[in-house]
Amino acid sequence: MRYSGAMSTLLPFRSCLVLPLILMTLGACATQVELRMAAQQEQFAREAASQGDWAQAMRSYQAAVDNVALGRGDFAWQAHLHHQAGRAASGACRYDAAEFHFRQAIALAKKSEYSSALSYKALIEQYERQGKATQALAVRNELGFHQSRALGAFADRESLPVGKPCGVPR
């Protein structure tokens, strides 16, 4: 059998076609792993919140947010997780983190056409609890007149966690 130069280039050419498919498959597996981890972290966060361990809930929700972002999860889920992380941060008296998470939830909700009303309500409520009426009014003004009045429909819906006031030893 004679040696053919064409045969020696065919194998590397085939591997160039197969390698991207393998990499895409591995990428899809990694994405699924990240999303499963996010769901597990969300469950841990819910359990911590149900026990009043707001600091642990906040950390678990943050881990879930990070995993959903790595797994390229949808914006609605990310918005939900940020909202819950904001609630947990508020319960842990971490108002800076709570504001960040509520703002992220609002921004992501707008991208996904998911309702941002609960996050707006929580942010306003947090400012009011802190005695920051000016900031609460500014958030209401972001909404506009009709949307701000529509928040009244959520009066009986979830609010921020109620526990010992911040600054009181647990």
Tell where the protein language model's regions lie, with residue ranges:
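Flexible helix-coil transition and linker loops at the boundaries of alpha-helical arrays
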Residues: 30, 67-76, 108-113
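Residue register of alpha-helical TPR repeats
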Residues: 39-40, 78-80, 118-120, 138
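Structural signature of alpha-solenoid helical repeat junctions
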Residues: 36, 73-77, 115, 135
